[in-house]
Amino acid sequence: RDLQELSKTFLPDGIQGDTRYDYQKIRDKKINENFTIYILSNQHEINFRAVLAHELMHVYLFVNNISLRNSLVEGFCNLGTEHVYRSYPNSKIGQLKLKAMAKDKDPEYGKGYRIMSSELKNIGWKNLIGKLEKY
């Protein structure tokens, strides 16, 4: 299946990953949770890892039942992407991707990322995670 069709989202550069979360409920308790992560094939290994990190951040939000507005969801998830690219300081791909993320005009993936990245720099991971539900 086409990843863009599956995600029902349009991005100028295309969709590189998507996460699906399904569950059943019995008396307000979630049971049988299922996560499915789709990732575009034939990517460079660093890009694959960055997309996987982004999608796993979505899983974190689902598992912890954290609801944020869309821009902050994608911004938070892009912190996983940022972490991967920063972990390859000698990679031209990582450097270029980080620059592109910093300039991204998209209100969710760009602006939301810059908001969350600034928060992370100011208060650190532990405090950011603890504060997520207040955004």
Summary of predicted features, one role per range:
Residues 31-52, 64-68:
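Short pre-active-site segment immediately N-terminal to the catalytic Zn-binding motif
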Residues 1-35, 42:
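Auxiliary, metal-adjacent structural segments of Zn-dependent hydrolase domains
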